[in-house]
């Protein structure tokens, strides 16, 4: 991986990341393609209408079905999905916790049962790297010990200590594999934990950032805490993260979250919000959210967002989108997803341009003014 900082404007950063498959300009939002596809879209839709340089895949789901060995046989993720740009795959730990009953964690890893057939599985730090080697992703996330908030101080402390031990095991294993010719073009990120406790976040960041990782993520946020708590935690944590490596905030979030966390020095984001909300009838615009289910759009001939350059806004009316949604027409899911993802990626592009031109604060003021804030 090649990483360079192109420009900073206060704490906001415009950077360039080069992987084996694409050149990624930050700030970047990564559409979520959980099972190897962004829901309602195919690789042609992505290439034609969204044009992301990187998307996210889910290690847990791809391991459970169709299986990482199958995907390896089919040319890894790039050959299997025909998406030619970069993939980031998460470790699958979050899904192992959230989708499985009777999850057990020990010093070696996580025991869980498949949400599909109840079969028993064991994820270890080395196992999730082996799986991601088979998937062939450009950026791999390591296994970490997740903590659901609120949690006791003892539980958070134990989580940080275990995450550090697993991180040490993971980086040693990955670098040894690379010397054997395995995962040579794959990059690996560690995940900083600690809840919203500043002392724990500092401890986790300092312990992990001394290790030879290609980038670092802030995990364990956007799980129900107040927005300001998230922002404060990110602002506190980034000061302990190396400037010369990418910073990734996992599972975040709303357009406001993206703007606020870019202003605090974050480079990379992912979230299911634009795709999930699209399917549920919520569309994102420069002026806030549009609930396409509302009767007021029945005869509205205007686009979803008059400032949006996406194919949907250039072609179709709010009235038509509302009709498709109410009819449960599959075409609606595709069009709404294209619009929401275009909006998100264009927002990142606008932020990058503002940083490069040293007018990020003005951009932020305009962003909120359009929303009446």
UniProtKB/Swiss-Prot annotation:
Required cofactors, per record? Zn(2+)
Write out the pathway annotation from the protein's UniProt entry: tRNA modification; tRNA-queuosine biosynthesis
Please list the disulfide bridges.
Answer: none
Which domain of life does the UniProt lineage start with? Answer: Bacteria
Catalysis: reaction(s): 7-aminomethyl-7-carbaguanine + guanosine(34) in tRNA = 7-aminomethyl-7-carbaguanosine(34) in tRNA + guanine
One GO cellular component term: cytosol
Q: Which UniProt keywords apply?
A: Glycosyltransferase, Metal-binding, Queuosine biosynthesis, Transferase, tRNA processing, Zinc
Q: Where is the active site?
A: 90 (proton acceptor), 270 (nucleophile)
Please give the residue ranges the record annotates as the region RNA binding. Answer: 251-257, 275-279
- Report the co-factor binding details: Binds 1 zinc ion per subunit.
What Gene3D superfamilies does the database record attribute to this sequence?
Answer: Queuine tRNA-ribosyltransferase-like (3.20.20.105)
Q: What is its EC number?
A: 2.4.2.29
BP GO annotations: queuosine biosynthetic process; tRNA-guanine transglycosylation
Q: Which positions does UniProt annotate for substrate binding?
A: 90-94, 144, 193, 220
What is a single Pfam family found in this protein's UniProt entry? TGT
Q: Which PANTHER family match?
A: QUEUINE TRNA-RIBOSYLTRANSFERASE CATALYTIC SUBUNIT 1
Q: Which family does it belong to?
A: Belongs to the queuine tRNA-ribosyltransferase family.
Q: Mind telling me what this protein is named?
A: Queuine tRNA-ribosyltransferase
The organism named in the record is: Sulfurovum sp. (strain NBC37-1)
């Amino acid at each position: 991986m090649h990483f360079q900082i192109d420009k900073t404007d206060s704490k906001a950063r415009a950077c360039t990341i080069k992987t084996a498959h694409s050149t990624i300009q930050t700030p970047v939002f990564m559409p979520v393609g959980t099972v190897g596809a962004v829901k309602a879209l195919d690789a042609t839709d992505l290439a034609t209408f969204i044009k992301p340089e990187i998307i996210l895949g889910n290690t847990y789901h791809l391991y459970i079905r169709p299986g990482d060995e199958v995907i390896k046989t089919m040319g890894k993720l790039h050959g299997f999905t025909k998406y030619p740009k970069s993939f980031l795959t998460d470790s699958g730990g979050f899904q192992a916790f959230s989708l499985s009953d009777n999850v057990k964690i020990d010093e070696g890893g996580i025991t869980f049962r498949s949400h599909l057939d109840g079969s028993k599985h064991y994820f270890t730090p080395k196992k999730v790297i082996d799986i991601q080697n088979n998937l062939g992703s450009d950026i791999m996330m390591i296994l970490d010990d997740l903590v659901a908030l609120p949690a006791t101080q003892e539980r958070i402390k134990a989580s940080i200590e275990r995450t550090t031990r697993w991180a040490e095991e993971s980086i040693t294993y990955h670098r040894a594999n690379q010397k054997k010719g395995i995962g040579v073009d794959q990059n690996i990120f560690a995940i900083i934990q600690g809840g919203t406790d500043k002392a724990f976040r500092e401890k986790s960041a300092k312990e992990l950032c001394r290790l030879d990782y290609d980038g670092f993520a802030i995990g364990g946020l956007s799980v129900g805490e107040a927005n300001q708590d998230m922002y404060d935690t990110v602002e506190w944590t980034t000061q302990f993260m190396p400037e010369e490596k990418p910073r990734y905030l996992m599972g975040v979030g709303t357009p406001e979250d993206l703007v606020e966390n870019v202003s605090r020095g974050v480079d990379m984001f992912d979230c299911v919000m634009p795709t999930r909300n699209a399917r549920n009838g919520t569309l994102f615009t420069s002026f806030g959210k549009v609930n396409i289910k509302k009767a007021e759009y029945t005869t509205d001939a205007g686009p979803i967002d008059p400032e949006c350059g996406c194919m949907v806004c250039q072609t179709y009316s709010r009235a038509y989108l509302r009709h498709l949604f109410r009819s449960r027409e599959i075409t609606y899911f595709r069009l709404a997803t294209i619009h929401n993802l275009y909006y998100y990626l264009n927002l990142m592009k606008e932020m990058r341009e503002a940083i490069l031109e040293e007018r990020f604060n003005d951009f932020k003021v305009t962003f909120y003014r359009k929303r009446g804030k």
